[in-house]
Amino acid sequence: MKLTLRVWRQKNADADGAMSTYEVDNISSDMSFLEMLDTLNEELIIKGEEPVAFDHDCREGICGACSLVINGDAHGPERTTTCQLHMRSFNDGDTIDVEPWRAAAFPVIKDLVVDRSAFDRIIQSGGYISAPTGAAPEAHATPVPKPDADFSFEHAECIGCGACVAACPNGSAMLFTSAKVNHLNVLPQGAPERETRVLDMVAQMDSEGFGGCTLTGECATACPKGIPLPSIAAMNKEWLRATRKARG
């Protein structure tokens, strides 16, 4: 395959960025999108040019590091992570636009790499269990109803890639935050801190500069792990419950 790439290049958060055009050839349809970018960078290095900076780690759809807007879609045309997107999803001769996540809370570090530490701070504010749970109990000593277990597992699949924020016209992080709240709050171990957890995490999310949620649903559509839109409603219910309890 021969492709034309229009790639966002930006030295740092304070510099102005622009799209740069590159031609790449001999791209196999079996390559992942990141392998295609590797090929581009190899050619740029041979020419003595600066390679394109982009984020990646596991390349197995687990870590959530890869974060590209491809032809206007977070992670590209398929509902998967960028590292699991293959070039067979494109046609020979295509022009492909490659940009970083676009959100005020995700400033550009360089080229296609953005700073997503705002997500880390949301988790640090309450996305954990610190209440003493004692020694490891016998496996069946703390029963968890299957619907609760399924609900928790479904939300624990969130990898924090940020596609929900990139896809949202408001740059909202509600889907991410709701996934992190919901996967702990329904478990017995997470119940003692459920009120403080949701209040603290929502407050931290708001302080990071993410936009407000208007339930457009773009977040759930873009999520490569299928976190459902009703997750947001579940968190809102938790937040209202905790707020009323805090007010007495």
Give residue spans per PLM region:
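Eukaryote-biased recognition of intrinsically disordered, low-complexity regulatory segments
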Residues: 1-23
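Short, contiguous acidic and Ser/Thr-rich linear segments
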Residues: 20-32
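Acidic/polar N-terminal loop/beta-strand segments that form early-domain functional surfaces
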Residues: 8-10, 25-27, 57-59, 71
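A generic, well-ordered mixed alpha/beta core segment in the N-terminal half of proteins
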Residues: 63-118
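Structural beta-strand/beta-sheet cores of well-ordered domains, especially the beta-sheet scaffolds
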Residues: 3, 20, 64, 94-96, ...
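Ferredoxin-type iron-sulfur electron-transfer modules in oxidoreductases and energy-metabolism complexes
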Residues: 31-50, 96-248
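A basic, amphipathic helix-loop patch mediating RNA/tRNA/ribosome contacts
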Residues: 39-73
